[in-house]
Swiss-Prot record:
Keywords (A to Z) from UniProt: Amino-acid transport, Glycoprotein, Membrane, Transmembrane, Transmembrane helix, Transport, Vacuole
Protein name: Vacuolar basic amino acid transporter 2
A GO cellular component entry from the record: endoplasmic reticulum
Subcellular location: Vacuole membrane
Main location: membrane
Any matching Pfam family: MFS_1
Glycosylation site residues: 420
Family that this chain belongs to: Belongs to the major facilitator superfamily.
Cytoplasmic side: 1-33, 86-97, 143-167, 218-238, 295-303, 353-375, 469-474
Length: 474
């Protein structure tokens, strides 16, 4: 695996692996304290990334940033659930998603411009003052939950009880199991000689499965605050909702992964232009969240919203299959809107469908559990889409270039393109057109998979409505 890939992979591994810990840990240590830790780790990580001396240090600091980043979204959602009544929860989640969407749009749209104009370091350093300001605001406005304040005036008042509450063994098992799984996905879809079926890579998957099974057994017996209480996931209804969350996470992140590649390689966009092309459609993601929030508060129509959101995601993924190199820009932008709007509706509705099944005291761990399953889906979505594109692209090149180049030149070209997609710019004539056409078809194959999984999520919605909700303590 290219060392440069670890810049992204390191963050992905730690953010996903540590994310499920924040629910139970914040129950034991306090929301405010854990939020300060997460924001501090994220801030220090971004600062260190900006001053990294080499790519190894940059990758390591991205891992530190991921430890904090994995908790920021989870804890902000949990804090909202603590202080906001359920009747108004949708509106506040809508505004949270609006701000999150605005930040994502800014990052996607201007990241390439910042990197190409004043340098990549500023993509990290620009986040530091924003994170410092958020810490100051947290100090004044974010309290610990009432249950924590009644039991502990500080984390040092009763350290023995707190240590008994923290599920240390469960934390080690889930972090190790998820890390091995993410390493399997990352190495399997890399451009090296390794693949998902390589014995050394398969060992990572086997190890991940064994350790995660041990984690489940441990969670059933632990006397500490479970990372994922089994009562949250032991009903058919809960399993179906979490499965929907995995599928929409897979489809949405596979979609976001393939779009920039398609724009840059098939349409010939620069990095900055590819980001800007996503700006207007991306605005519909927070719009979808606002629609969800106000509809929930006024009509209490979670079930209908989930159908609408997933249907729009399916439509958006399906429409992408018809985008061509010759498609006008206005039509491309129009075809991108449904998937973004659907994601904005689906993400909060799956969250509330799950956490509203449980009592207020269980909603922190329920939130982190759902976010974990969604994150797993997103990681699998990106990794499998990358694998499908790579395998399809290589196969199509061998087939389509057979009459233009000899076998050795085709193999050499595949290696060069796998290592650096910008190598396409040095090609000419029929060879270049064939390479672009092959990549177009490869991305469409990956996107067809996302379309099918979106339809499967829709089928599970129908199945969910025929299942009884679990009876939980209130």
């Amino acid at each position: 695996m290219s060392i440069s890939n670890w810049i992204t992979t390191a963050y992905l591994i730690t953010s996903t692996s540590f994310q499920p810990l924040y629910g139970s840990f914040s129950d034991a240590l306090g929301r405010r304290n854990c939020l300060f830790f997460a924001n501090g780790a994220f801030t220090i990580g971004c600062l260190a990334c900006g001053f990294s001396k080499n790519i190894y240090m940059l990758s390591f600091m991205r891992a530190l940033t991921g430890i904090g980043g994995g908790g920021l979204i989870t804890l902000s959602t949990i804090v909202n659930s603590d202080v906001i009544p359920s009747s108004k929860r949708g509106i506040f989640q809508a505004f949270q998603n609006l701000l999150l969407g605005f930040g994502a749009i800014c990052g996607a749209s201007f990241g390439g411009t910042i990197a190409s104009s004043i340098g990549w370091r500023w993509c990290f350093l620009i986040q530091v003052p924003i994170s410092v300001i958020s810490s100051i605001l947290m100090n004044y406005y974010v309290p610990n939950q009432k249950e924590y304040n009644r039991q502990n005036s500080s984390i040092f008042q009763n350290p023995g009880k707190i240590l008994r509450d923290i599920d240390v063994m469960g934390s080690i098992l889930i972090i190790t199991g998820l890390t091995l799984q993410l390493l399997y996905l990352s190495l399997g879809c890399s451009t090296s000689k390794l693949s998902w079926t390589s014995p050394s890579v398969l060992l990572l998957l086997v190890g991940s499965v064994i350790i995660l099974l041990l984690f489940i057994l441990h969670e059933r017996k632990t006397s500490a605050r479970a990372i994922i209480p089994m009562e949250l996931v032991n009903s058919s209804y809960s399993v179906v909702v979490l499965s929907i969350s995995i599928l929409v996470g897979f489809a949405s992140y596979a979609y976001l992964f393939t779009l920039p590649l398609f724009f840059q390689i098939v349409l010939g966009d620069s990095t900055a232009k590819a980001g800007l092309r996503l700006t207007i459609p991306s605005l519909f993601t927070p719009v979808g969240s606002l629609i969800t929030g106000f509809s929930m508060s006024k009509y209490n129509c979670l079930r209908l919203l989930l159908y609408i959101g997933i249907s729009l995601m399916f439509l958006g993924n399906f429409l992408f299959l018809f985008i061509e190199k010759t498609s006008p820009n206005w039509l491309i932008g129009l075809f991108l809107i449904p998937a973004n709007l659907g994601q904005g509706i689906t993400f909060p509705t799956t969250l509330f469908t799950f956490i509203f099944m449980f009592s207020k005291s269980d909603q922190a761990t329920a939130t982190s559990t759902l976010y974990l399953f969604r994150s797993i889906g997103s990681v699998w979505g990106v990794a499998i889409s990358a694998g499908v594109i790579q395998l399809s692209f290589a196969g199509l090149l061998r087939s389509n270039l057979k009459g233009l180049l000899d076998e050795n030149k085709i193999k050499k070209l595949i290696v060069q393109l796998s290592a650096n997609s910008s190598y396409i710019g040095s090609l000419h004539g029929e060879v270049k057109n064939t390479v672009i056409k092959s990549f177009d078809e490869a991305t469409k194959r990956a996107h067809l998979m996302s379309t099918l999984l979106s339809s499967l999520a829709l089928i599970l919605c129908i199945l969910k409505d025929n299942l009884a909700k679990p009876k939980t303590r209130r």
